[in-house]
Amino acid sequence: AGPYAFGL
């Protein structure tokens, strides 16, 4: 998972 997976 990457930052965008957490909405960041």
From Swiss-Prot:
Q: Which domain of life is it from?
A: Eukaryota
- Record's keyword terms, sorted: Amidation, Neuropeptide, Secreted
Chief localization class? Answer: secreted
Question: Cytoplasm: is it a keyword of this entry?
Answer: no
GO cellular component terms, semicolon-separated = extracellular region
- What is its subcellular localisation? Secreted
In the record, Leucine amide modifications are located at L8
Single Gene Ontology BP annotation: neuropeptide signaling pathway
Protein family membership: Belongs to the allatostatin family.
- Free-text function comment from the UniProt entry: May act as a neurotransmitter or neuromodulator.
| Protein's name in the database | Carcinustatin-8
Source species: Carcinus maenas
